[in-house]
From Swiss-Prot:
Originating species: Escherichia fergusonii (strain ATCC 35469 / DSM 13698 / CCUG 18766 / IAM 14443 / JCM 21226 / LMG 7866 / NBRC 102419 / NCTC 12128 / CDC 0568-73)
Signal peptide: none
Entries under CDD domains matching the protein: EngA1, EngA2
HAMAP family: GTPase_Der
Role this protein plays: GTPase that plays an essential role in the late steps of ribosome biogenesis.
Pfam hit, one: KH_dom-like
Family listed: Belongs to the TRAFAC class TrmE-Era-EngA-EngB-Septin-like GTPase superfamily. EngA (Der) GTPase family.
Residue ranges annotated for the EngA-type G domain, each copy included: 3-166, 203-376
Keyword Nucleotide-binding: yes
Assembly and oligomerization: Associates with the 50S ribosomal subunit.
Protein name, entry field: GTPase Der
C-alpha cells in the first residue's frame, strides 16, 4: 500500500499551505483564518519517484465546542489512518498549551512523528524552535511553507529516509496505479480514442446543493462512516473534499462540496473561495448529484446551480433529500412543483431519499452509472448518420427562402457530454424548434439517460466557390467557334 502522511496541529499553523506545497496543487483552501479546514482532505504526493498520500486536517486547539469538536475528531481519525505524522507548530506564536496536548496524544499513539516548526521566515530558526524541544518529540524541522523554504530539506531528510525503510513492494501497487490514472486525467493526458476505456477510470461524482441540504450526511451515508463533518448549521463544509471509494467493483471519487448561496448573501471571503471550489468541482466531475431539500422546495438558487451544471455539460442525478416525515399531501405538492419547475430536465433521474436514515440511497448509484455510461458511450459515424436520416424522414427540415435545408451526415464531436456534429447546407438557418427535435430524437434513439446531448451544425462548403475553371486549348477553340456562330445568327 502507498504510505499515508497526516498533517496535524493547531488551527492556522499552515497545514493546508504545506499540503498544497507537497501535492503541488491548490486543492486545499488557504487563508489567514483559524479553523478553515474542517474535514480530512487527501492528496497525492511524490518524492524521487516514491508516492505517498498526504492528509490535510482541521486544527485542534483543545477548546472545541459545536462543529469544532467534530473537526478535532476528524484530525484524530487522520492520525489513526496515517503511517507517519507531521506535527506542525507555529514558530511565531511560540509554544501553546494545545501543542502540548497534541504532543501528549501523539506520544501515546506510538506512531512515527516528526515535529515541523512553520512560519520561521524572518526569524532565527535555531532560536525560534528552542521552546518546542520540551514537547519531547526529538529533532525539530524549521520551514516556511508559504515560501517553500525548508520543505525540500524536510522531504529529503525526514520523509524520504522513512519511506526507504519501508519494505520494497515487488507487486504493482493498486493505489499507485489509481493515483497515476487520477493525475493523468487531471493533467489532460488522454489516451488515443481507439484505446480509451471509460470503465478503467474512476467515476468522479460531485454532490452539490445549497447550504445545509444534507450533502455531507449523504456522503457519510454512502461511505458508511463519519468521513466529513456533519452539523446542523449552514456552511459547515467549506472546501471540496475528494474521497476515493469503491462500490460494487467500480471505483469512484466522491466530491463533497460547500453549499452555494445567492451571490448577494455571500459576504465572507472564505465562503467566496468555497463557492469557487464547488463550481470547479462541478467542472471536474463526470456526474453531479444536485441535492434539494424537500422541506424547502426548489429555490431560484437551485435553478441557478442547475443551470451551471447544464452549461458545464455534466451528467446529472437529482436527489430530493429529507423525504422522510412528510405527509402524503406535502409529497404530492413537492412532486408537482418539481414537474413544474424542472420539467425541462427530462433526461435526469429524480430520487426521493432520506440521507439521515438511508432510505432510497442504495438506488442512487444505478442512476450514476447509467448517466456515466451514457455520457462516455462511443457511437460511430454510420450509426449517427443513420439516426439523422431517420429523423429527417420522420420530420423534414423547414423551407428557408423557398429552399429545403439539407442535412448530409453526422459524426461524434466529443464525449462527456456527448456531442453530435451535423454537416449540411443552410443549417445556420434551422429554427430552434427543429434543433430541439433532433436533440430529442438522438436521445431517444441512443437511449441516453442522465446526460445532456449537444448538437453542433457545420455548413457544407462549396468546393468550387471562388475558383475559376481554366480552359484547355481544345476548349478555347470550341468556345471561339461557338461565339462566331452566335454572332452570325444575330
Amino acid at each position: 500500500m502507498v504510505p499515508v502522511v497526516a498533517l496535524v496541529g493547531r488551527p492556522n499553523v499552515g497545514k493546508s499551505t504545506l499540503f498544497n506545497r507537497l501535492t503541488r496543487t491548490r486543492d486545499a483552501l488557504v487563508a489567514d483564518f483559524p479553523g478553515l479546514t474542517r474535514d480530512r482532505k487527501y492528496g497525492r504526493a511524490e518524492i524521487e519517484g516514491r508516492e505517498f498520500i498526504c492528509i490535510d486536517t482541521g486544527g485542534i486547539d483543545g477548546t472545541e465546542d459545536g462543529v469544532e469538536t467534530r473537526m478535532a475528531e476528524q484530525s484524530l481519525l487522520a492520525i489513526e489512518e496515517a503511517d507517519v505524522v507531521l506535527f506542525m507548530v507555529d514558530a511565531r506564536a511560540g509554544l501553546m498549551p494545545a501543542d502540548e496536548a497534541i504532543a501528549k496524544h501523539l506520544r501515546s499513539r506510538e506512531k512515527p512523528t516528526f515535529l515541523v516548526a512553520n512560519k520561521t521566515d524572518g526569524l532565527d530558526p535555531d532560536q525560534a524552535v528552542v521552546d518546542f524541544y520540551s514537547l519531547g518529540l526529538g529533532e525539530i524541522y524549521p520551514i516556511a511553507a508559504s515560501h517553500g523554504r525548508g520543505v525540500l530539506s524536510l522531504l529529503e531528510h525526514v520523509l524520504l529516509p522513512w519511506m526507504e525503510d519501508l519494505a520494497p513492494q515487488e507487486e504493482v501497487d493498486e493505489d499507485a496505479e489509481y493515483w497515476a490514472q487520477f493525475e493523468a486525467e487531471e493533467n489532460g493526458e488522454e489516451e488515443e480514442e481507439d484505446d480509451f476505456d471509460p470503465q478503467s477510470l474512476p467515476i468522479k461524482l460531485a454532490i452539490v446543493g445549497r447550504p445545509n441540504v444534507g450533502k455531507s450526511t449523504l456522503t457519510n451515508r454512502i461511505l458508511g462512516e463519519e468521513r466529513v463533518v456533519v452539523y446542523d448549521m449552514p456552511g459547515t463544509t467549506r472546501d471540496s473534499i475528494y474521497i476515493p471509494m469503491e462500490r460494487d467493483g467500480r471505483e469512484y471519487v466522491l466530491i463533497d462540496t460547500a453549499g452555494v448561496r445567492k451571490r448577494g448573501k455571500i459576504t465572507d471571503a472564505v465562503e467566496k473561495f468555497s463557492v469557487i471550489k464547488t463550481l470547479q468541482a462541478i467542472e471536474d466531475a463526470n456526474v453531479v448529484m444536485l441535492v434539494i431539500d424537500a422541506r424547502e422546495g426548489i429555490s431560484d438558487q437551485d435553478l441557478s446551480l442547475l443551470g451551471f451544471i447544464l452549461n458545464s455539460g455534466r451528467s446529472l442525478v437529482i436527489v430530493v433529500n429529507k423525504w422522510d416525515g412528510l405527509s402524503q399531501e406535502v409529497k404530492e405538492q413537492v412532486k408537482e412543483t418539481l414537474d413544474f419547475r424542472l420539467g425541462f430536465i427530462d433526461f435526469a433521474r429524480v430520487h426521493f431519499i432520506s440521507a439521515l436514515h438511508g432510505s432510497g440511497v442504495g438506488n442512487l448509484f444505478e442512476s450514476v452509472r447509467e448517466a456515466y455510461d451514457s455520457s462516455t458511450r462511443r457511437v460511430g459515424t454510420s450509426m449517427l448518420t443513420r439516426i439523422m436520416t431517420m429523423a429527417v424522414e420522420d420530420h423534414q427540415p423547414p423551407l428557408v427562402r423557398g429552399r429545403r435545408v439539407k442535412l448530409k451526415y453526422a459524426h461524434a464531436g466529443g464525449y462527456n457530454p456527448p456531442i453530435v456534429v451535423i454537416h449540411g447546407n443552410q443549417v445556420k438557418d434551422l429554427p430552434d424548434s427543429y434543433k430541439r427535435y433532433l436533440m430529442n430524437y438522438f436521445r431517444k434513439s441512443l437511449d441516453v439517460m442522465g446526460t445532456p446531448i449537444r448538437i453542433q451544425f457545420k455548413e457544407g462548403e462549396n468546393p468550387y466557390a471562388n475558383k475559376r475553371n481554366t480552359l484547355t486549348p481544345t476548349q478555347m477553340r470550341k468556345r471561339k467557334r461557338l461565339m462566331k456562330h452566335i454572332k452570325k445568327s444575330k
